[in-house]
Amino acid sequence: MLIQSDYHIHASYYRVKAEGAEAGPTAVQQQAAARAAGCRYVGLLEHCNASPKHPFSCLVALAEEFYSDDFDRENTFLGVEADLNDDGSDACGAEGRAKLRLHYVIGSVHLSPAIIPTLDEYIRVEFNRIRNALIHNRNVDCIGHPFGEGIRYEKAGIIPRWGYDLIPSEYLQEILKLAKEHQVALEINRCDLQNEAYRRFWEAVRDNHLLFEIGSDAHRTANCTAVIERTQWADALGLQEEYHWKPRK
């Protein structure tokens, strides 16, 4: 049986917001919500990318809270969700990781129809970024929500339905091969749990003993419960705790 853990929890209090916007939770608030949801291990992070909402200073402030004298760090880890570039490098880098004293880096791709209008091009770009990160970037411990932005093309009305069956099988096979070769975890996340092709992808993760990680991607305390369903789904699929990735301190 899987131990419930969540390493993709945003302490969004520190990001830059418009005047009057909701403050967002601090690290201690998200930690409490994750523990209340049943998580034994908790990972707290924020975005690192080119957005003006996510300057590096917000990560510095999060790290200061995490390493403050009165913060309970038992079974709790500090990470970052860093955007992947075309060459596979990440927005945080090894220097940023060391400065912030991070325990892990999740490398993710964040795209949308406003940035790349066609689904095929989006899939190609995300695949190449993930592939290059797996081959070249030893700073990245996990690939966050692979192809999790595909649902945006359905919501925008560009395609009638999103699913992993729209991704070329050779792309998925290459990701599986490289993730195993370089011992990088893949994340269960977002909107694909009911898709049969997604299920087959994760059966391959199971059968080939790849590392995996489960995240809620919670930006609010109420969303920390999302990890429960995803953990139950992974458990029912037969994923083993032995390959359930965990950061190192």
Q: Where are the model-predicted features located?
A:
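Hydrophobic alpha-helical segments and helix pairs
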Residues: 72-120
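Alpha-helical scaffold elements within enzyme catalytic domains, especially in hydrolases
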Residues: 33-36, 132, 178, 204, ...
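Mid-to-C-terminal alpha-helical segments outside catalytic/metal-binding sites
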Residues: 225-249
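Active-site-adjacent beta->alpha loops and helix N-cap segments on the catalytic face
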Residues: 53-63, 115-120, 195-199, 224-225
